[in-house]
Design a protein with these regions (language model features):
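Bacterial Sec-dependent N-terminal signal peptides
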Residues: 1-23
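Acidic/histidine-rich, surface-exposed loop or edge segments in extracytoplasmic proteins
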Residues: 23-36, 71-79
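Short, flexible N-terminal segments of the mature chain
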Residues: 41-59
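Short amphipathic alpha-helices in soluble, non-transmembrane regions
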Residues: 43-49, 88-99
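Short, intrinsically disordered low-complexity segments
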Residues: 54-94
Length: 132
């Protein structure tokens, strides 16, 4: 009986420390390759730099998920935590106008309110936090 209780407590502790399997993001930019790599993220970096300065935001964090394919494809998933509702709307508006112009090597696409499930990602894909 004692071993059963200890085993159940141990299993309960282990399950409490597991990573969430899916996360919902309000904004996800997918950098995809057509043949020769992914688009340059310099225009995005510049837009984020200006946005931070305009709204006096100290840090804007995103999750970089990848590699998603053989040619360096990856996702940038923005949680938009710490922004006001107005800032979120303006950020999405700026992203919507910027992303279609990012076509130098591949293509960048924007998806909103997307849930990313860890089980659906390639086995070699990792998630890292990127601060702008």
């Amino acid at each position: 009986m004692k071993q059963i209780i200890i085993s159940l407590l141990f299993l309960g502790l282990i399950s409490g420390f597991t990573q969430p399997t899916s996360v919902k993001y309000p904004v996800v930019i997918k950098f995809q390759s057509i043949c020769c790599g992914v688009p340059d993220d310099a225009p995005l970096n510049e837009m984020i730099k200006k946005f931070k300065k305009q709204y006096k935001i100290k840090t804007l964090s995103t999750t970089r998920i990848g590699p998603m394919g053989k040619e360096g494809e990856y996702y940038l998933a923005f949680s938009l935590k710490g922004m006001t509702a107005k800032q979120k709307l303006n950020f999405k508006k700026k992203i919507r106008s910027l992303v279609p112009t990012m076509k130098d090597k591949g293509v960048a696409t924007l998806e909103e309110n997307i849930t990313i499930n860890a089980a659906d990602l390639p086995s070699r894909a990792t998630s890292t936090t990127v601060n702008f």
